[in-house]
């Protein structure tokens, strides 16, 4: 897994999931948190609403995590051996086992999202966020130990990726107390895009450099340009997020005029029949007015 495919495809998934989250968050901000369903005919309304409520993000996590898990297991000719047969025995394939753990965690996170949205009688956002925080925390620990034997360009690339994961962990932890805050959702989406795009870039830097020549660990200019590329990714991903929001806002205001902001309807007012106490008070007030008139 420590190859181009092992960095590019997980990064592609994270970037695609970040784009999906960007569309969801943009729609939520434009509609001010309203739940919107696609327009459909009355006879197909129930079927369409069920399709709309499916946790596509959870399904994407399950499918991607399962495929990557099988890839890790099958990419080794000798199989996923935990301990060597030599004396004294040693652990085998530590990085592959770390990759396997990461992808299993991704699959479990998708299962939790799907169960919360489609299996439980009521969606439990706290369960989804808590599980995601726990998984990102474990991912951070795995990545810190994953970069222990790295040096030079590879160490710098992984250090910047660890920085993004750490910031994402802080944002997700804050969302446990404020899950509906738009600013935190935007930051989560942006960091997810950063994590995916930089992981794809890491595959090109470490295994398929565009110039055709490998990066030099002892060249300070290569280290500096890694940081420069990271800053470019920050600007590009921020532009992606801004562009998705702008396009969604333009599409809503120009091409979807029928999708109005749903405001809470006022409760109907019902005139209640006066009770005996109310009638008694009216009689007392009437008698007081007559006494004052006399």
Question: Regions from the language model: what does each represent?
Answer:
Residues 1-130, 136, 148-151:
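Early transmembrane hairpin module of multi-pass membrane proteins
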Residues 130-142, 153-177, 183-205:
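Alpha-helical membrane segments in multi-pass integral membrane proteins
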Residues 10, 57, 102, 132, ...:
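Eukaryote-biased feature marking scaffold/signaling PDZ-domain proteins and nuclear chromatin regulators
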